[in-house]
Regions:
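Extracytoplasmic surface signature
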Residues: 1-40
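Residue-level hotspots within well-ordered secondary structure
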Residues: 39-176
Length: 176
């Protein structure tokens, strides 16, 4: 840019918009406004089916996009009101009946992400928030993460009642 940038904004898709006193940006004519789009955008897609729990429809969603140098945040809802929750992160997709690995589990529940890294959380009123700090390392760009929550529901005496799973997320790490 051939002059001052006075304002910056990030669009919902991650593009950067700059406004200022410049008339060129990146060697191109650009009167006072420029848009920078990354060749490697961060994306998140929902895949697979969840199975219902005592808390309702288990749902796993992204609350932010996985950009290098940021904290990628996700949230599970509709989980049992009290459960130990495995936060499953993997580098490949799977499709294993949950009952084959963690009985008792209802028919239709499946493990949809390879358990390469597993963290444990406790549901709070049927909700679990998870986060993953992504270093500002461009070599992470394009790496695909498969993620899912598996809830191990317990009763008041901490006896296991049933195990259920959410849909999966497929997150591609992006960078500028």
């Amino acid at each position: 840019m051939n002059s001052n940038v006075l304002a910056l904004a990030v669009l919902p898709n991650g593009d950067l918009v700059a406004g200022g006193n410049f008339t060129t940006a990146g060697g191109q004519v650009s009167a006072y406004i420029a848009r920078y789009a990354t060749p490697c955008p961060a994306t998140v897609a929902i895949t697979g089916a969840a199975c219902a729990s005592s808390g309702g429809a288990n749902t796993y969603t992204a609350r932010s996009l996985p950009w290098t140098g940021s904290t990628y945040r996700t949230r599970g809802t509709g989980l049992p009101s009290f459960a130990f929750v495995a936060v499953v992160n993997g580098f490949s997709a799977t499709s294993i009946p949950l009952a084959a690995v963690l009985p008792p589990s209802p028919v239709g529940c499946a493990v949809l992400a390879s358990p390469d890294v597993v963290d444990v959380a406790i549901s709070n009123a049927g909700t679990v928030d998870a986060q993953l700090a992504l270093p500002n390392t461009p070599s992470l760009a394009g790496i695909v993460l498969h993620q899912q929550l598996v809830a191990l529901e317990v009763d008041g005496n901490l006896n296991f009642v049933q195990n259920t799973s959410t849909n999966a997320l497929v997150a591609t790490i992006g960078t500028f």
